A protein has these predicted regions:
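Peripheral interaction segments used for macromolecular assembly
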Residues: 1-118
C-alpha cells in the first residue's frame, strides 16, 4: 500500500527512456474506488498538462515508465483534498488528507482524515 503523496512529483519516462515530466495529480473514479490515471506536469514549458491512464503504465518504482499519454478523464484528487468529511449523523470527522492506494491494482483502499486543530 502507498499513499497519494508517494506518487506526487514522481518522474515519468516513456518506453524509450525519454523524460516526460512529473506526476502532478491523480485521476480517481470515486464511485468504483480506483485510480484511473495520473496528470503529468510536462518537462517542456510549451506542452500542456498531459495524462497517463493506469493501463499505459509499464512499471512503478522510483520512477514511472509508461507506454503513451492520452486525454484526461476522471476527478482530480486535488479537487477534493481538504474536503470536509461528515458522518451519517452529520458530525464533522475531519478533512480528507490523503488516499491509501494498492500499488498493483491501483484500488483506493482507504482515506486518511485529519481532524485538524480544534
Amino acid at each position: 500500500m502507498v499513499k497519494w503523496r508517494n506518487f506526487y512529483l514522481m518522474k515519468i519516462y516513456d518506453s524509450k527512456n525519454k523524460y516526460i515530466g512529473v506526476v502532478d495529480d491523480i485521476s480517481i473514479d470515486f464511485y468504483n474506488g480506483v485510480v484511473k490515471g495520473f496528470t503529468i506536469s510536462p518537462a517542456s514549458i510549451f506542452k500542456k498538462h498531459t495524462y497517463v491512464s493506469v493501463d499505459s503504465i509499464i512499471s512503478v518504482d522510483e520512477i514511472m515508465k509508461i507506454k503513451n499519454t492520452s486525454r484526461f478523464e476522471g476527478l482530480k484528487f486535488k479537487e477534493i483534498k481538504y474536503m470536509d468529511i461528515i458522518n451519517k449523523e452529520k458530525k464533522l470527522l475531519g478533512v480528507l488528507e490523503d488516499l491509501i492506494i494498492d500499488e498493483k491494482t491501483f484500488e483506493i483502499k482507504g482515506m486518511i482524515i485529519s481532524s485538524g486543530i480544534f
